[in-house]
A protein has these predicted regions:
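Post-transcriptional modification and biogenesis factors for structured RNAs
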Residues: 1-274
Length: 274
């Protein structure tokens, strides 16, 4: 299943401090890693949240980036003030030995394009730069496959589509939610307490017929999907509105709780039906 989620840019509005906002983003990122989310879409819900939007996108991308070239990609910014207290994701694109002698042929690594002594190369996190001429700009992230190993490394650039298993998530900023949903080619799951209760037999069967492309959409704490979309919700095709938290004991479900809960339910029943 190719799983994506959409979250409003106002998702951080209930947190007042940079540290708490950072921790909330981390919780969402970890849930996405655990349940193999391929893309996180941050959409605008009608409010102006420029600072939160920038923070959200920056930290999501930072956490997904392998540690060995985070400084190269992000430099220094106050937005990352509290990321040092966050647990690492340890998703597949971040797992790999730093010992060059242990690198295996055909191993896939994240890399960043660098320039050393006037020549381009790539840093793959092994303490040495591998010579590689790239058409990309310095600082650009790419994915490479190891063609030859220690001591004379060589690499080949590949696309994410060439990786057979889950690798990591990507982050995308987008416009209004209705536009995203109208252009989505696949099943759309709208999470709402006003929706039908989750039915494993019915809803997982829908996911299996989705051609592998599923978008799970979340509202914010103070504005649900129906409030954000209004009457336009009735014009959506190939969508389901589902309540994943029947008989909830709290007045509201926080966004990080909603992401974890909904994805765990989908994952549990999807896995059990394979």
């Amino acid at each position: 299943m190719n799983l994506s989620i959409a979250i409003p840019d106002s998702a951080l509005s209930d947190e007042k401090t940079l540290e708490n906002k950072t921790r909330k983003i981390s919780s969402i990122a970890r849930s996405c890693g655990i349940f193999r989310v391929n893309e996180i879409i941050i959409y605008r819900d009608g409010k102006k949240n420029e600072s939160d939007l920038k923070l959200f996108v920056t930290i999501l991308k930072y956490l997904e980036t392998p540690q060995y070239f985070r400084k190269t990609v992000f430099g220094k910014t106050n937005l990352l003030k509290f990321v040092g207290v966050l647990p690492p994701l340890k998703i597949p694109n971040q797992i790999g030995t730093a010992n060059p002698k242990e690198i295996k042929k055909n191993e896939i690594r994240e890399a960043v394009v660098v320039r050393v002594k006037g020549q381009k190369g790539v840093d793959v996190g092994i303490g040495q730069i591998i010579n590689y001429y790239s058409k990309h700009d310095i600082g650009k992230r790419i994915i490479v496959k190891i063609k030859s190993v220690f001591p004379d490394f060589s690499v080949k650039e590949i696309t994410r589509d060439e990786i057979p298993n889950y690798w990591s998530y990507s982050v995308k900023q987008s416009g209004n939610l209705f536009s995203i949903l109208s252009n989505w080619n696949g099943v759309k799951i709208l999470t709402s307490r006003k929706g039908k209760l989750f039915n494993p037999e019915r809803d997982i069967d829908t996911l299996k017929k989705s051609n592998g492309s599923v978008l799970v959409v979340f509202g914010s704490t103070d504005r649900g999907i129906h409030d954000i979309l209004g009457n336009k919700i009735n014009n959506l095709q190939n969508s389901k509105t589902i309540n994943f938290f029947p008989n909830q004991g709290t007045q509201t479900v926080r966004i990080e709780e909603a992401v974890l809960g909904c994805l765990s339910v989908i994952n549990t029943f999807d896995s059990s039906n394979k």
